[in-house]
Amino acid sequence: MNKVNFQSEGETLVGNLFLPTSNIQDEKLPAVVVGGSWITVKEQMANLYAERLAEQGFAALAFDFRGYGESSGEPRQYESAKNKTQDFKNALTFLQSQPMVDPDRIGGLAICASAGYMARAVAGDGRFKSFVTIAGWFQHPDTTPESYGGAEGVRRRVDLANAAMNKFRSSGQMDYVPAYDPNNENAAMFFEVDYYADPKRGAIPQWENQFAVASWSEWLQLNGIDGVAEKITVPVLFIHSDNSALPDNVRRFHRLVKGSKDLYWSSEGTQTDYYDQEPYVGKAAQIAAVHFRNTLA
């Protein structure tokens, strides 16, 4: 694994570039940009999948989005679909500049919320040649209120977000709540999620259990399906399960994609099982590698 950095709209993003150990000298590699769940850092699920893809012969880049982990950017822990979409595009630009990478054979793999962000990048940037989502979370106005206390819960959080952003712009100070706290209804994740509670899983030292309140505005008003799925023309593979997040939204996105598409559906595994648990990660990574091998040839 090589520690790398690159620029994204004036910010320095820090990443881990995983390479195959058996690469033939001077052979140009297919490459994959990898993104994890919302409010996470590269050392969580992104690193894990990038390492697995490298074992399968790909150059794979996991990185911290602006405002997260080792990357620069303010406010910290600010969840922005717009920013993350652009960061994915700039990660691809970085991979294209690497001498061991074939600049015309680069795809994207996204876990959870990154699926919606990366989909926007893939739809708007023809340099992405293939796309895989794993336990993808595709936000849509029809379903968002179900997770946040209905329309009133959404409005309340958006109002808080707008006030927090106005405060940040005038004072440079951001309001924060916990990213995860099942005992705090104001937390970003106010329900039980073992992954973020367990130091052996997601509650690692590199991860800040913090959420910029201003994030609610973009997150809760995001439509990650309509006007996005229809624009994707590269081969897409959706890996999902009955017990992963928003299964009907994944099916909806899949239906709207007009190009080559595949859906691998399992009756086993929860959303967070696909973050770091076996056999789910191993199986998903293997299926993704086959897809990339066939579509980045």
Language model features with spans:
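The serine-hydrolase catalytic nucleophile loop
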Residues: 38-51, 65
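Catalytic active-site module of serine/aspartate enzymes centered on a nucleophile-bearing elbow/loop
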Residues: 267-269, 273-297
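Alpha/beta-hydrolase-fold enzymes
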Residues: 119-199
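N-terminal cap/lid segment of alpha/beta-hydrolase-fold proteins
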Residues: 1-27
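Short beta-strand/loop motif that positions the catalytic acidic residue
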Residues: 231-232, 238-240
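Catalytic nucleophile-loop/oxyanion-hole region of alpha/beta-hydrolase
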Residues: 42, 68-103, 278-283
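Conserved alpha/beta-hydrolase
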Residues: 52-72
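Short beta-strand element of the alpha/beta-hydrolase
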Residues: 27-37
